Curated annotation (Swiss-Prot):
GO cellular component: cytosol
Keywords recorded for this protein, A-Z: Amino-acid biosynthesis, Aromatic amino acid biosynthesis, NADP, Oxidoreductase
Binding, shikimate: 14-16, 63, 88, 103, 221
Name of the molecule in the record: Shikimate dehydrogenase (NADP(+))
InterPro entries associated with the record: Aminoacid_DH-like_N_sf, NAD(P)-bd_dom_sf, Shikimate_DH, Shikimate_DH-bd_N, Shikimate_DH_fam, Shikm_DH/Glu-tRNA_Rdtase
EC annotation from Swiss-Prot or TrEMBL: 1.1.1.25
């Protein structure tokens, strides 16, 4: 039986195995997907060594906080990873580890389904890590020319200017000044507000008087409605959580590992419903 993994620091509440194992079963693929928690960088190194030696491992997904660290161990990267400098999917190809990013594809598809136009909109990204990079790249692929980025460490937001200098303009915003400007769309890519710390929010809409955003997106899916999204809805913004993004990026990863074809919309809805029950 072939093996697939999700690696990250804390995966107790991850529903990725549910999604992937359902897809594998649907296509009759003899493989199992499971979570592996890695508490530190040393354990990440050990995991990579294990993967290289185990002939049954096809590949793995990466989540917080290793989406950037994993590149150190990869032999090749896809074009999007070369730009984004973060990966969420790795495939074993012979002796080589090849890094891909399907996060931006999942994000882009979930945004397109909501029917929100991002062109010529003032967009604020909260966070500047691997998830933020995928989000920014997805927006670029949707025609966005510039984005505002607020991060607790201003230097990290500033560093994204160099990452994306060839494709779009990054406008860093100091964390404490994130309420001063008007935005049409606000996107949270941080883990602030994720279960179990559900009272937290990366943006206090009570403090925000510059205008009501048209759309507010949270990459978090557990809880399904974060404090961040609840407050945005009270103000009148349309909102979306990260569950569809999670499912759609998983589908794209399976395509990389097994060259599967697109899944039917009815099957995707079935997966989404099962995920909603699990959260």
């Amino acid at each position: 039986m072939k093996k697939l993994y999700l690696i990250g620091k804390s995966l107790k509440h991850s529903i990725s195995p549910l999604i992937h194992n359902k897809i594998l079963s649907n296509f009759g693929i003899d493989a199992v997907y499971s979570n592996v928690e890695l508490p530190d960088f040393e354990k990440l190194k050990e995991f990579v060594e294990m993967v290289k030696k185990d002939g049954d491992v096809v590949g793995f997904n990466i989540t917080i906080p290793y989406k950037e660290d994993i590149l150190e161990f990869c032999d090749e990267v896809s074009e999007d990873v070369r730009i984004i400098q973060a990966a969420n999917t790795v495939k074993k190809e012979g002796e080589k580890l090849v890094a891909y990013n399907t996060d931006w594809l999942g994000f882009k598809r979930s945004l397109e389904e909501v029917g929100i136009s991002v062109k010529d909109k003032r967009i604020l990204i909260l966070g500047a890590g691997g998830a933020a990079k995928a989000c920014i790249y997805g927006l670029y692929r949707m025609g966005v020319k510039e984005v505002f980025v607020a991060n607790r460490t201003y230097e990290k937001a500033e560093s994204l200017k160099e990452v994306f200098q060839d494709i779009l303009k990054i406008l860093p915003v100091e964390w404490l000044r994130r309420y001063e400007f008007k935005y049409d769309i606000i996107i949270n890519t941080t883990s602030v507000g994720m279960f179990p710390n559900i009272e937290s929010s990366p943006f206090d809409f009570e403090n925000y008087v510059a205008g009501i955003p048209v759309f507010v997106y949270d990459m978090i899916y557990n809880p399904p409605k974060t404090t961040f999204l609840e407050e945005a809805e009270k103000k009148g913004s349309k909102t979306e959580n990260g569950l569809k993004m999670l499912v759609y990026q998983a589908v794209e990863a399976e395509k990389i590992w097994f060259d599967i074809v697109n899944l039917s919309q009815s099957f995707l809805l079935e997966i989404l419903k099962e995920c909603e029950k699990k959260i």
